[in-house]
Amino acid sequence: MSVLLETPYGTRDFLPREAAAKRAIENKLAKLFLEFGYEEVVTPTMEFLETLKISGGVESDLFKMFDQNNRTLALHHELTTPIARLVSSRLKDSPLPLKLSYNTSVFRFRKNQPERQCEFYQAGVELLGASNAFADAEIIALAAQSLKVAGLKDFTICLGQVEFSNGLMEENNLSPAVKSEIKNAIERHNIVELEKIVDALNFEKSAAD
C-alpha cells in the first residue's frame, strides 16, 4: 500500500460510528468531572523537551522535533507535567485546592510493542493543593465512577505510592540505570519485565516481594 494512504506507526483513523462512540464517552466524562468540581484546561500538544523531562519519563518514548530556532520540542506523553507547568505560570496565585480536568491525545513511542498504539486518548483530573484522606477518597471515587460511565463493569483499581518504591530502591543501593529500568517497567505496567529485573538483582525474598 502507498505510504500516502497509510497512517503513521501506532496511529489510527476513527470511522463515523467509532468517532461518535468516542465522543459520547468524552462527553460523559467531561460532565462527570464538572459535577465533581473539576474545570477543563487545554495545554499545547507539544512542550519543550526539558519541561517534559521533569516528570522522569523515558526520553526514548517521546516523539521529538525541532522548531525554527533549533529548540527541542516533544509531543506530550502525559498531562500531569504540562498542567503543573500551566499552574506554575498562569494559575500560581489561584486559591487552593485547584481542581482541573483534561481530555486529549497523548503520544508514546512503542518501538518493540507493535500491538500498542502510539497515539491514545486520555481523560483525567488533577487535584492540586489538597493532601488529605478526603482528597484521596475523592480521586478514587471519581476513578471508579469514570470507569462506570465509560461502560466498564468488571474492573479493579490498583493504588500505589511512588515514595515506597523509591525508598526501596534507595535502601538497596541500586544504580541510576537499574532505577530507570524499574521505573520504566512500572510506568508501562510491564510486570514480566519488572520481575526479570528484580530476579537479576538477587534480592532477598522479603525485598523482592
PLM features: residue spans?
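Extended, charged alpha-beta segments that form solvent-exposed binding/catalytic grooves
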Residues: M1-T81, R85-D209
